[in-house]
Amino acid sequence: MKLKNRVIIFLSSFLIFTSLLICSAGAVIGIQEEINQFPGFSGVLIKDLNTQEVLFSHNEDKLFTPASLTKIFTLLAALETLGKEYTYPTSFYFSSTAPGEVNGNLYVAGSGDPTQSLEVIRKIADTLVQKCNIKHISGDIVLDNSKFLPEEFLGRGWMWDDKNPLIGALTVMGYEVKEKQNSYLKTMPLLWGNFFSQELSKKGLKIDGSIRIGKTQEGLKVKYIYYSDTLDKILAYMMKKSDNQTAENIFRTLVPEDNPDGVSTIARAIASLEEVIDTTLSLKWGKDYILVDGCGLSEYNLMTPAHLIKAISYLYQKYDFKILDYFASTKESGTLRERLPFQVWGKTGTLSSASAMAGLLQTKNKRWVVFCLMENNFISIEDENDPKIFENRIIEYIYENL
């Protein structure tokens, strides 16, 4: 009887193993057929999340324009450099000799907080008036935008005629460039200042001067500091909504605060990112990959599917399944909502001739896999050659067969 049971167990295990092999073989054949039919240049890497076994690979070490998959590297670098509890301060300086009076200018020093929507600016104005009991400003509202270089309001390699986010130490969340302007350098901080002054005026506060850009006067003590939400929440928003303004401001914030002149330049942000990626992933900037922004709008960016898998796997090893909280999901809001009929967590990327998707899913066979799909050099048309349809079909093969 014992022998009979052993035989049954052996045969059952053999049949299960054989069926898994057949399913895996079917997935490989199906994925390869999709790749053969796709009219552009594609790269695919699929691994078992826990064992790191390669389940399928194609051009996994070739360089691609990653589009918004760049944000995965921004996520990793921000967590490693700044930490989940980091907050952006916006500081207010002025001198006062009488209750309710600001003698001279009110200075507002930004740090690149990407979360300041109109509602947040209203909240800041409310708190400032109540906390400091301000009724009158005899001078100007001076906007200190010096944390970032004014000439770096756009990223390197961005298409100048696209709708790009404006980057600055003082930014209004959700505002993008609608058309070509020669006043880019001052647009964003002045936009912030106009909304802020309007909210102050609504509360009966009188402003004698104007709104202008300048540096905070030395010797003044800070009177009030507004702190943003924690970086943990900001990163989740950046990833799920694929928000370019948020990603680029975070990228510029990677620069250590103790740098010589306190300015977060693009070159310094690249150097900070380079150091983190070298330390965590052992990848060399300029040799293995190139990234010059944090959002993925740059056509200069280059990385491979293997790089993205390495980054996601590192995040999983360090944060376990908590990393799923950062990714968009087919069952929740975000760029993947309802894209597929089963649960997938991931990051999408789209430019005019680049599409990509990377993430994690649990297959029907209860196997956790990490995947990266990248496509370049195609003519984007909404038919059977649409790269998003190509990606969906491959992910369906993964879910059904691996």
Task: Label each region the model flagged.
Residues 50-51, 62-65, 98-99, 112-116, ...:
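Solvent-exposed loop/turn segments at secondary-structure junctions
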Residues 21-63, 85, 125-135:
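Beta-lactamase-like hydrolase cores
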Residues 52, 66-84, 141, 195-200, ...:
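Active-site SXXK
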Residues 176-322:
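A small/polar active-site loop signature that marks catalytic segments
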Residues 80-95, 103, 204-212, 320-324:
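Short, well-structured active-site flanking segments
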Residues 55-57, 255-402:
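Small-residue-rich helix-loop
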Residues 88-150, 157-162, 172-173:
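Active-site-adjacent, His/Asp/Glu-enriched structural segments that form or flank metal-binding
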Residues 11-20:
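Bacterial N-terminal signal peptides
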